[in-house]
């Protein structure tokens, strides 16, 4: 069976995502569309507005055949690490083609990735503490490969291409033109809105009828929503009670940020105010949110490394076509394929230990078990 894969967050699923899945299937002439989707937490450093099962269900109803979870250890990362986690998972699923939407589908992404293969991504080129890492990275890209575009989806596509190049058997890259509003912009264009706009409308109880598939309008209205508003008290408690030595063990903690975070938390009444207090030219808001989320979830560097050493494919759902594909490849996959979560998988040394730890807060807030005993949606 011909397969095409996509990496997504679906935060939440909307008409632009339905278009992207249809384009991927059409352009790749694929029988099966495999999606690696962020679990309950997303790259911008916050909980997804709906839990992973709700978002997977929406995707399966609108073009995806299989949805596999991108675990928190890969989902809440900077672009290159996010891309690596998603690309390796798709490759482990036996996917032939990697499709992604971009502002620049005409670009030869594989060629650019080869030019960047020897570019130094740390060291002297990244010692300007008045600029973010992303700004300095763009300068390195421009020097190494003449890259001047900085559109978010172009840069993410480039990260996909670099991760794909590192595979033993790279997938075919299939960039296609995005349609509608830009990444994280607010607004609506041709009945397609950014996920940011959809989240804004949902949280304000405004109608999303024009910008999400019709059958999802009432479905979304019934679901528990998640945001930093619910998580901030947990972050505050962690920062006020944890020892500095504990905070230094958190994944992505660097350069004395534990001092800055603990000094600024007492007076902050919400996440927005806290981020303004700790913001500097060196770090983007997304970088700081990711660190704050890692602190909240007690996501240590050790736990992240352990999870990466034991990769697995946690299937959230599949269609009949997806089931057929899984049955045909399940004995040939390099990674374990998980279709039912047992207690031993969630144990401290289990393959889903970090996912379970992170998801417990979602379960506490929403009252719906996220892992134990859950079977794939069908």
Curated annotation (Swiss-Prot):
Bilayer-spanning residue ranges: none
Pfam family, any one: HIGH_NTase1
UniProt-listed GO biological process terms: tRNA modification
GO cellular component, one term: cytoplasm
Cellular compartment(s): Cytoplasm
GO molecular function, one term: ligase activity, forming carbon-nitrogen bonds
Full protein name: tRNA(Met) cytidine acetate ligase
Alphabetized SUPFAM superfamilies for the sequence: Nucleotidylyl transferase (SSF52374)
Domain of life: Bacteria
Catalytic activity: cytidine(34) in elongator tRNA(Met) + acetate + ATP = N(4)-acetylcytidine(34) in elongator tRNA(Met) + AMP + diphosphate
E.C. numbers: 6.3.4.-
Entry function: Catalyzes the formation of N(4)-acetylcytidine (ac(4)C) at the wobble position of elongator tRNA(Met), using acetate and ATP as substrates. First activates an acetate ion to form acetyladenylate (Ac-AMP) and then transfers the acetyl group to tRNA to form ac(4)C34.
Main localization, broad class: cytoplasm
UniProt xrefs under Gene3D superfamilies: HUPs
Organism: Lacticaseibacillus paracasei (strain ATCC 334 / BCRC 17002 / CCUG 31169 / CIP 107868 / KCTC 3260 / NRRL B-441)
Binding site for ATP: 7-20, 101, 153, 178
NCBIfam families: PRK13670.1
Family statement drawn from the similarity comment of this UniProt entry: Belongs to the TmcAL family.
Keywords assigned by UniProt, alphabetized: ATP-binding, Cytoplasm, Ligase, Nucleotide-binding, RNA-binding, tRNA processing, tRNA-binding
Enzyme class: ligase
């Amino acid at each position: 069976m011909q397969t095409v894969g996509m990496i997504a967050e679906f935060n939440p699923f909307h008409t632009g995502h339905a278009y992207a899945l249809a384009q991927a299937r059409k352009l790749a002439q694929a029988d099966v569309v495999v999606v690696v989707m962020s679990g309950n937490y997303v790259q911008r450093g916050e909980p997804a507005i709906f839990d992973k099962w709700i978002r997977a269900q929406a995707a399966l109803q609108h073009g995806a055949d299989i949805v596999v979870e991108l675990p928190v250890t890969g989902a809440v990362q900077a672009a290159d690490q996010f891309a690596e986690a998603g690309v390796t998972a798709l490759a482990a699923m036996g996917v032939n083609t990697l499709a992604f939407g971009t502002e620049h589908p005409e670009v030869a992404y594989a060629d650019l990735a080869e030019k960047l293969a020897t570019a130094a991504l740390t060291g002297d080129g990244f010692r300007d503490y008045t600029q973010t890492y992303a700004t300095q990275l763009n300068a390195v890209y421009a020097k190494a490969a003449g890259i001047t575009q900085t559109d978010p989806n172009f840069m993410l596509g480039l990260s996909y291409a670099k991760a794909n190049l590192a595979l033993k058997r790279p997938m075919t890259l299939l960039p296609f033109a995005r349609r509608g509003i830009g990444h994280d912009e607010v607004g609506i264009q041709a009945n397609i809105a950014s996920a940011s706009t959809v989240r804004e409308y949902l949280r304000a109880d405004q109608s999303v009828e024009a910008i999400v598939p019709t059958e999802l309008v009432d479905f979304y209205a019934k679901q528990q929503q998640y945001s930093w508003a619910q998580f901030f008290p947990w972050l505050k408690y962690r920062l006020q009670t944890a020892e500095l030595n504990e905070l230094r063990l958190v994944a992505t903690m660097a350069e004395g940020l534990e001092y800055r975070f603990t000094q600024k938390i007492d007076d902050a009444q919400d996440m927005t105010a806290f981020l303004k207090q700790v913001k500097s030219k060196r770090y983007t808001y997304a970088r700081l949110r990711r660190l704050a989320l890692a602190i909240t979830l007690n996501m240590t560097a050790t736990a992240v490394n352990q999870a990466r050493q034991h990769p697995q494919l946690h299937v959230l759902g599949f269609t009949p076509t997806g089931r057929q594909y899984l049955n045909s490849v399940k004995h040939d996959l390099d990674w374990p394929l998980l279709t039912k979560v047992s207690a031993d998988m969630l144990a401290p040394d289990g393959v889903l230990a970090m996912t379970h730890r992170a998801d417990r807060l979602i379960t506490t807030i929403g009252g719906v078990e996220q892992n134990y005993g859950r079977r794939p949606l069908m």
